[in-house]
Amino acid sequence: MLKNNLDVRQELAALYRILDIYGMTDLANQCAAARSSENKNTFLVHQYGMFYNEITASSLIEVDNNGKPLDPKSPWLNDGCLNLCKWIFNTREDVNYYVHGHSENVMAVGGT
C-alpha cells in the first residue's frame, strides 16, 4: 500500500519518539530522516534544537535534494543531517528512512 506524506510524517515523528524512549539521543547532531512519499526528490528532517520528544508530524521540515527547505521561512536545520540526507537519499533510491547516531545502542544495531 502506498503511503501518503502524512503517514510518512507520522512515522518519522514516531521514530523520533522511539529513539527518545530508548535513550538514543545523547548528541545534538544525531538525526533521522525520511524521503517524502509525494516527491521522491524531497525529504523530511527535524528542526535543529528540538528535543526528540518534542518532534511532531507537523514540526518536520521538507527540504529538496540539495538540502534547501521548501519553505524559505523554515527554522534553522542541522547541516550535518542535511549532508547525510543528500548523500544517502540522492545515491540510494531504495532508501526511504535512515537514522544517524552515535549512541552505543545505535552502534550495536548498526553493527548487526
Regions found by a protein language model. Give the residues of each.
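Active-site metal-binding loops of divalent metal-dependent hydrolases
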Residues: 103
